[in-house]
């Protein structure tokens, strides 16, 4: 029994940094993310699109065939698991965010340790990093794909930097996992694979320029592709079994590339530059940390030139991949994966401050003071996050105040109700009412998908759903025959700084 207790104690001691990062993640997301149990619900339309798809899979729906959406299938497989724990609350979503953000903080801390060693500075770095990212504009409502995938990039950076510092090639395990992560990124949101293109270019330069070992390079490429293909095989098998490979390529690739509305004739590279600059200007703190990180790596370039090259290539790849398509505010969050280098630079400056020699007994007091200061920094950062987060206003509302739950009370008076979220992205009404869409275009998307409007119009004109929900514009303002429906309820709620009115229409008896 004692041996088992000692073994558990040793395991906890070894994993103290990971446990700390998960704790910090849970604490900051409790405040900064609307998926937190402190909020009535996460009312972000993107999150609800993912949840509706995940819940649809649990009910036998096939993405892109039975339910249309724009992101990649791996995201929906993940959200099918989330939906199992998300039936009555957002605990499943919150847990997903805590784990993925906690892993990001952990691998960011491991990057910091490459430069600072086992320094106590790593602990406040984690807290400050969580506070900076959690309160940035790009964090949005919490629960974005970009937020969920931050740990993929942090792990990739950690692997290549650690291998460089140890003067060795990437191990089989490191390469395979990065290949799996690249496959996940590709089948979640393929623009994020720009990071891995940058990493691949760095590995090529590193193996041929420094290691001078093309055999290891070929092995590394093979292991990486093995991981990537493992994820891709699972995706293909699922859609092959369901006879939906064509729909997968049409919806996920063709529609996203060619059907997004654009009237901008600016050259593509200039457009990427403009979007990147806008993201760095709009978000305040993490771009500053990135600039500081670049300055730090430039100072270190003589001793660690590969670190700067790895940073630049991975960062450039991610920027180009992210902004070659669109430039929504939350897209910039992926760049915060590089923020830790700025905090490492600041910690390095602080370590240059030398205290005078003090007696051994006094050293214990100094250590206690340092730990107290670290705890103070962590608590102050948490309090500051509450003050700066754009989301905390929603804590003042109860579930009953939300239009989603108000409408759900009426919707659930009908046996096996069907609803259509019309004219805007998924507002959370499927989630609140516990319904699964019967219309493939269960909401109105930003991409002008073929048949989207026609299908939704047909469902309304033919009375194929029990309820229709619109936002801002009543059904009467659309050019369609809505005579089979009557307005039964309306409710208002602020969303992203705008007071929206929602309208609930019910099929006439």
Language-model region placement:
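Specific aromatic-rich, kink-prone transmembrane helix
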Residues: 148-167, 174-177, 182, 203, ...
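Hydrophobic, aromatic-rich transmembrane alpha-helices
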Residues: 106, 281-318
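Membrane-interface alpha helices of multi-pass inner-membrane proteins
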Residues: 172-192, 196-202, 230, 315-323
């Amino acid at each position: 029994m004692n041996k088992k207790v000692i073994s558990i104690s040793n395991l906890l001691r070894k994993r103290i940094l990971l446990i700390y990062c998960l704790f910090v993640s849970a604490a900051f997301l409790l405040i900064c993310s609307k998926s937190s149990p402190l909020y009535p619900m996460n009312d972000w339309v993107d999150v609800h699109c993912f949840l509706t798809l995940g819940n649809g899979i649990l009910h036998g729906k096939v993405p892109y065939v039975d339910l249309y959406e724009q992101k990649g299938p791996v995201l929906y497989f993940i959200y099918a698991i989330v939906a199992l724990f998300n039936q009555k609350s957002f605990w499943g979503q919150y847990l997903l965010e805590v784990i993925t953000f906690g892993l990001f903080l952990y691998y960011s801390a491991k990057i910091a340790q490459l430069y600072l060693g086992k320094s106590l500075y790593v602990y406040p770095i984690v807290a400050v990093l969580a506070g900076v990212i959690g309160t940035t504009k790009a964090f949005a409502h919490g629960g974005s794909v970009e937020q969920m995938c931050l740990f993929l990039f942090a792990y990739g950076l950690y692997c290549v930097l650690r291998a460089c510092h140890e003067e060795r090639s990437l191990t089989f395990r490191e390469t395979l996992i990065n290949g799996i992560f690249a496959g996940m990124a590709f089948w979640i949101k393929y623009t994020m694979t720009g990071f891995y293109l940058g990493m691949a270019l760095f590995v090529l330069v590193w193996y041929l320029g420094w290691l001078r070992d093309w055999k290891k390079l070929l092995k590394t490429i093979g292991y990486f592709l093995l991981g990537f293909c493992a994820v891709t095989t699972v995706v293909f098998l699922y859609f092959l079994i369901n006879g939906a490979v064509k729909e997968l390529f049409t919806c996920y690739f063709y529609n996203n590339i060619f059907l997004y509305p654009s009237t901008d004739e600016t050259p593509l590279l200039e457009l990427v530059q403009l979007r990147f600059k806008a993201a760095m200007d709009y978000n305040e703190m993490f771009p500053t940390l990135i600039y500081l990180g670049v300055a730090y790596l430039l100072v270190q370039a003589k001793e660690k030139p590969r670190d700067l090259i790895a940073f630049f290539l991975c960062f450039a790849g991610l920027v180009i991949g992210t902004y070659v398509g669109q430039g929504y505010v939350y897209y910039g969050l992926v760049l915060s994966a590089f923020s830790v280098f700025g905090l490492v630079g600041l910690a390095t400056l602080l370590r240059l401050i030398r205290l005078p020699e003090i007696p051994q007994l006094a050293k214990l007091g100094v250590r206690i003071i340092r730990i107290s200061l670290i705890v103070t920094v962590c608590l102050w950062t948490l309090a500051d996050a509450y003050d700066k987060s754009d989301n905390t206003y929603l804590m003042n509302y109860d579930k009953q105040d939300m239009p989603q739950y108000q409408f759900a009370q009426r919707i659930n008076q009908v046996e096996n109700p069907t609803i259509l979220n019309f004219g805007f992205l998924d507002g959370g009404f499927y989630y609140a009412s516990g319904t699964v869409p019967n219309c493939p275009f269960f909401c109105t998307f930003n991409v002008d998908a073929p048949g989207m409007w026609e299908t939704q119009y047909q469902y309304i004109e033919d009375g194929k759903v029990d309820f229709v929900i619109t936002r801002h514009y009543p059904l009467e303002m659309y050019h369609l025959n809505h005579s089979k429906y009557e307005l039964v309820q309306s409710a208002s709620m602020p969303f992203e700084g705008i007071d929206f009115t929602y309208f609930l229409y019910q099929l006439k008896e």
